């Protein structure tokens, strides 16, 4: 048992290359992600067919490892403070097609297949279902959002039942 634990620890701590030079980070062949002070890296997720942005989330070291190995999106939920296998509750699993990392390895872009499903806990295909109008802002009025997606893919009350809403005020 002790050997298995040590083997796992060795694998987990050596999965990503240590950041030792700017050249290696920018031009090197090894994954050396830069996690923030909370141990997170931002992830923008897009639909592999349409190119639409589906969501913005975060991964920690463990969720990135699970995503790579399972080929299904696993994020770090900041609201629940836990690993979040996307679609485990709703059934709308994100099948990973590609993961890219930016030039200084501090942000991820992931393309996924969601079939005919959705990525937003509100029920829309994308978490970016509203648009902010451009132009002159009238200081006496509030900026009104424009809905770009009209129809929800599912009813969140039926899917999530008694689970708490992750949106915080």
How should each PLM-predicted stretch be described?
Residues 5-7, 11:
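Short, positively charged and aromatic/hydrophobic N-terminal segments
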Residues 16-40, 59-66, 71-169:
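C-terminal binding/interaction regions
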Residues 45-48:
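Short, acidic, Ser/Thr-enriched surface-loop or helix-capping motifs
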